[in-house]
Swiss-Prot record:
Name of the protein: Cytochrome c oxidase subunit 2
Subcellular location: Mitochondrion inner membrane
Enzyme class: translocase
Record-annotated disulphide pairs: none
Source organism per UniProt: Anas platyrhynchos
Amino acid sequence: MANHSQLGFQDASSPIMEELVEFHDHALIVALAICSLVLYLLAHMLMEKLSSNAVDAQEVELIWTILPAIVLVLLALPSLQILYMMDEIDEPDLTLKAIGHQWYWSYEYTDFKDLSFDSYMIPTTDLPNGHFRLLEVDHRVVVPMESPIRVIITAGDVLHSWAVPTLGVKTDAIPGRLNQTSFITTRPGIFYGQCSEICGANHSYMPIVVESTPLPYFEAWSSLLSSS
């Protein structure tokens, strides 16, 4: 959950998000190093006179050709590794289908019989004390902690996007097309997200709430919901 005046990322709650935060820090260090080098060279040019030999030197041309290539490699390798990790879905313990509508989400637990529900935002007038405005829903997505979860995402009308920042998940929901993503929650808790694709007048009223619980609690919840 983001805090007021927060500048950094939310606390990572999945291995993918942890990797994304580390890559952000890595890229930021590289960018700061480049900025420092450029500022140093600018200051040196302003304070010192340049000779024609320095401008036309082959060594300088070689350096400013090789250095950008090294920088690109330093950024590309970890980026490609994370991209492959985000696309890899290996034997999930649970498959969840998320369907975007104007303006709510429908969920189907395909591994269970008759376990599906619609998830609407709770209006501000009905919101209990201590809950978050425009983020709470009447039915949360409950998943077992530390288990691979596959999410199949589509839409029933227009473009939507299923996004939960603290899990490092953001996948477009496209009518007539099935996209998929996966995540593993590393701790129990409640994680908030929203539709991240402009989808109409009430686009900002499509929150997503994922609740991560230990496996026994998830089994009890699924049994209760299936029997009701």
